Amino acid sequence: MSNEPTSSFYELRLPPSDGISSVNFCPNSVNLLVTSWDSTVRCYDTQNNVQKWQYNHKGPVMDGCFPEKNKVFSGDVFGSVKHYDPVAGVEKEVGSHEDGVRSVVYNSDTQQLFTGGWDQQLKLWDIRSDKMEISNHDLQSKIFTMDVSPISNMLVIGTADKYVTIYDTRQMETHLQKRESSIKYQTRCIRTFTDGKGYALASVEGRIAMEYFDPSPAVQSKKYAFKCHRLTESGVDVVYPVNCIAFNPHYGTFATGGCDKNVFFWDGANRKRLHALKTYPTSISSMSFNTDGNILAVASSYTFEEGEKDHPPDQIFIHNILSEKIIKPIK
């Protein structure tokens, strides 16, 4: 049996000074976008472990995305949506929501920016035009999480009322589907499958649901849910929220991070857990794989699931996956 390490990790220097809300790799790059409750949006060169640039909001930044080298988008707790071009060094206001912007996603295939807010609104923006806001959709409940598939062009939105709304981004006049979450507790995170055929949904109740877009009975029979991020403490089963999901773009397997301070790798097709990474100092707030799927960024940042209390500092760990066996699907 080989004793060679399966992964190595290091901590990014000079992390944000408050909670880390999101981490996202720029495609085909070692550059990592980090948004924070300290009102900053930062970019780190993960290979050289240095911060490259930073811009600020007037309040805590809840989400961001880095779809192309000259396109960065971010949204804050006051409803402001910003666009930053790192190549030109130019920052501009895209528009705003009436309440906090919880989720920011960009579809590179259709060149569309989507923002979802606590004001219950889904907004579609065209950053190429002077009048950037194209459409506005009232989802009648706070938006908690969104993701878009560049393969199928499906936009998936999870709301506070435990519904999931699905749009085809090429036909935004009305939603394609609206379905009740198969998990009865609050949705924390939604991420689309790498093949574009469905999505994984994480909940506060230590459970993941694997769902499919195709409404036919044959395809819907494949959906399932499983328990995770649970510990037995003093003979009691303790359930932790699952905060984030990150799909490996190369293998289609995925990682989950929870308030139990753990990150696990899963093979969804074979319904198996592949690997457990190290236990972190505190809750896992966000994760992102690079395009090649051999680097995973992990934000260890207390998510206040137990209210205000002393907690470890906010940190970002970069994992180099040295052995494909911990992330490759089971044959």
Swiss-Prot record:
Keywords for this protein: Cell cycle, Cell division, Mitosis, Nucleus, Repeat, WD repeat
Major localization class: nucleus
GO cellular component terms, A-Z: bub1-bub3 complex; kinetochore; nucleoplasm
Places the protein is found: Nucleus
Annotated SUPFAM superfamilies: WD40 repeat-like
Top-level taxon of the source organism: Eukaryota
Keyword Repeat attached: yes
Any GO BP annotation: mitotic spindle assembly checkpoint signaling
WD repeat windows: 15-54, 56-94, 96-135, 138-177, 237-276, 279-327
Family statement drawn from the similarity comment of this UniProt entry: Belongs to the WD repeat BUB3 family.
Function description: Involved in cell cycle checkpoint enforcement.
UniProt name for this protein: Mitotic checkpoint protein bub3
Organism, scientific name: Dictyostelium discoideum
Organism lineage string: Eukaryota, Amoebozoa, Evosea, Eumycetozoa, Dictyostelia
